């Protein structure tokens, strides 16, 4: 539908910036479990990486000794907050893929009153990602 939210999105993009315990193991988790790819790590020892899948980019930065990881659910555990909402073409297919790879599904797939079909996963650092498709397309 031409009037849907997804169709009206400008051609801009955004990349969530996640502070993680271990950049290398997190990048490998995103590759092996969530189907993302990466080309390189920055610095030695590695302290930064960008993972990509179908145009989605997530930045991973090494937790400094004085820093604190803070997934949104840590700030508001009752709020059901996501750290990222990722628009996809087929939620059912991706949900099946993730389940076959042992990804932790924190909310199973369902149709939402806001016109999307989506589900939530939790990554190896506790970040919550929601993957959803626009039902009006």
Where are these regions (language model features)?
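Major-groove DNA-recognition helix of helix-turn-helix-type DNA-binding domains
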Residues: 34
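Conserved active-site tyrosine of GNAT-family acetyltransferases
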Residues: 26-31, 98, 123-126
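Conserved beta-strand-loop-alpha-helix junction that forms the acyl-donor binding cleft
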Residues: 20-22
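Vicinal oxygen chelate
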Residues: 2-17, 37-89, 95-122, 132-137
């Amino acid at each position: 539908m031409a009037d849907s939210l997804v169709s009206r999105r400008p051609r801009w993009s955004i990349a969530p910036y996640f502070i993680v315990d271990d950049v290398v193991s997190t990048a490998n988790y995103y590759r092996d479990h969530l189907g993302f790819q990466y080309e390189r790590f920055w610095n030695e020892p590695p302290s930064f990486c960008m993972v990509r899948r179908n145009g989605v980019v997530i930045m991973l930065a090494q937790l400094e000794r004085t820093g604190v990881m803070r997934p949104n659910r840590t700030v508001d555990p009752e709020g059901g907050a996501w750290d990222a909402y990722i628009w996809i073409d087929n939620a059912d297919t991706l949900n099946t893929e993730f389940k076959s790879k042992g990804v932790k599904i924190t909310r199973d797939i369902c149709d939402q009153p806001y016109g999307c079909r989506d589900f939530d996963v939790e990554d190896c650092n506790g970040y919550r990602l929601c993957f959803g498709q626009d039902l009006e397309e």
